[in-house]
């Protein structure tokens, strides 16, 4: 069973290249964080990716356990990098850079290399965050169709199952498939990027053909990774389930999730009661 997602919370979009952000031209006056992405096997960086010697380097390491069907007996990690001025748009990374500089044995060295470790971050999501910091959007871009007066995702369409292509990721920490934009939203919450939260919510509303199981696992992820006073993403899922209730009430996954319980389903009960009250008020006003 599938449900469509609804377009919500408009936000201004900035122009971006659809290519990888590591190809961006950066003024030499900006301090540089290496823009290589590679498997973490040593402290070295490929020669072609080495920055100018007079610029300092920052690197961000993420890690996750390699799947068992892969032929690697060790934990896989990836090295990301970015320019300091760009990274510090995020209050989280600005504070992390300050701490890293303070802890560096030679903070004034022009050739220093400072690492920021994010062991709990999914590499695919951090890639979206960095791309947004450089480009104001992340792939696929949200494009405004002036003819139809609607927003669209660039170069996307339904797959063989009718679901928007590349709408989901497998989240290794939870062991479930979730909507990528939900993970980006939660990461933006963590890193203090309010415009990115609005962008991720809008892009999530442009997907279609999403499985009920994916919506429910994404909703649980949203509840687990946002504060209790968060009013956008959580409300989006509650409204979606209520709007598509005829589909969800036939879903075996919905039954299993409700039996597990959690704050999501109490909020859903309250939202459903409010919805019924609104319908009753609207009906009485027409009488």
Give the label of every model feature segment.
Residues 55-58, 73, 124, 170, ...:
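Residue-level detector of functional hotspots within protein domains
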Residues 1-160, 262, 266-287:
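BTB/POZ (also called T1 in voltage-gated K+ channels) oligomerization domain detector
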Residues 118, 169-173:
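Intrinsically disordered, low-complexity acidic/Ser/Thr-rich segments used as protein-protein interaction/activation
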Residues 161-169:
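Repeat-mediated protein-protein interaction surfaces in helical alpha-solenoids
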Residues 129, 148, 172-183, 191-287:
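Alpha-helical protein-protein interaction/assembly modules
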């Amino acid at each position: 069973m599938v449900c469509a997602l609804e377009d919500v919370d408009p936000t201004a979009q900035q122009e971006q290249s659809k290519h990888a952000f590591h190809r961006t031209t950066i003024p030499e006056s900006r301090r540089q964080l290496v823009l290589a992405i590679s498997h973490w096997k040593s402290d070295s960086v490929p020669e072609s990716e080495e920055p100018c010697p007079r610029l300092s380097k920052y690197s961000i390491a993420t890690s996750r356990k390699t799947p068992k069907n892969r032929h690697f007996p060790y934990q896989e990690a990836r090295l990301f990098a970015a320019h300091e001025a760009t990274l510090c748009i995020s209050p989280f990374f600005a504070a992390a850079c300050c701490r890293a500089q303070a802890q560096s044995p030679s903070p004034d060295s022009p050739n220093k290399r400072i690492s920021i470790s994010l062991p709990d971050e999914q590499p695919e999501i951090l890639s979206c965050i960095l791309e947004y910091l450089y480009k104001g959007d992340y792939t696929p871009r949200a494009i405004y169709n002036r003819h139809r007066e609607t927003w669209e995702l660039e170069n996307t369409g339904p797959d063989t199952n009718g679901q928007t292509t590349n709408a989901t990721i497998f989240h290794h920490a939870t062991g479930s498939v979730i909507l990528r934009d939900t993970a980006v939203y939660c990461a933006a919450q963590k890193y203090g990027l309010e415009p990115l939260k609005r962008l991720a919510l809008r892009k999530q509303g442009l997907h279609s053909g999403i499985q009920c199981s994916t919506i429910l696992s994404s909703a649980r992820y949203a509840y687990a990774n946002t504060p209790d006073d968060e009013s956008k993403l959580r409300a989006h899922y509650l409204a979606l389930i209520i709007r598509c209730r005829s589909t969800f009430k036939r879903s075996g996954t919905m039954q299993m999730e409700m039996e597990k319980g959690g704050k999501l389903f109490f909020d859903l009960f309250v939202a459903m009661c409010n919805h019924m009250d609104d319908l009753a008020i609207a009906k009485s006003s027409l009488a």
